[in-house]
């Protein structure tokens, strides 16, 4: 299963035609197993300004499984990830990224993103990161 991060979904919903957006479209068309987390769901929806677009976006997102943060251990793991990054001189700008990473690690899923925070986290934690296939730009 591939968890698609907010950074990729935003490009998708805006029709940005970035490499990530276009690749997500291909993954959807191919019927790949995609998901998101409850925090990603919230991040995407909070950025939608218009009511009609909010509802369309919400309905689209609800087509995919939503992994939920239910275990206190996930929050503790996120704190440990943040502390490890800081100790190694890596800046993680958003705690929410540590939470998403901790849940992806706990659920043993791959994260498709375009956020430098996750690259930093993957350097110190066993976060599986989805990479665009070679030749995709």
Where are each of the predicted segments found?
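Short, well-structured N-terminal submotif of metal-dependent ribonuclease cores
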Residues: 1-36, 46-59, 136-137
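A general structural signal for well-ordered alpha-helical segments in protein cores
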Residues: 21, 41, 54, 75-78, ...
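Acidic, PIN/NYN-like endoribonuclease modules and their adjacent C-terminal/linker elements
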Residues: 1, 101, 105-137
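Generic structural signal for small/hydrophobic residues in well-ordered secondary structure
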Residues: 5-6, 44, 78, 104
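Active-site neighborhoods of divalent-metal-dependent phosphate/nucleic-acid chemistry enzymes
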Residues: 66-112
């Amino acid at each position: 299963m591939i968890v698609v991060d907010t950074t990729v979904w935003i490009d998708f919903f805006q029709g940005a035609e970035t490499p990530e957006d276009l690749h997500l479209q291909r993954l959807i068309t191919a019927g790949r197993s995609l998901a998101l987390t409850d925090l990603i769901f919230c991040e995407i929806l909070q950025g939608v300004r218009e009511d009609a677009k909010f509802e369309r976006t919400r309905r689209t997102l609800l087509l995919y499984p939503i992994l939920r943060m239910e275990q206190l251990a996930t929050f503790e793991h996120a704190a440990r990830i943040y502390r490890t990054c800081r100790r190694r001189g890596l800046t993680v700008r958003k705690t929410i990224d540590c939470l998403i990473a901790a849940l992806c690690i706990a659920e043993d899923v791959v994260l498709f993103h375009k956020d430098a925070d996750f690259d930093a986290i993957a350097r110190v934690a066993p976060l599986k990161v989805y990479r665009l296939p070679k030749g995709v730009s």
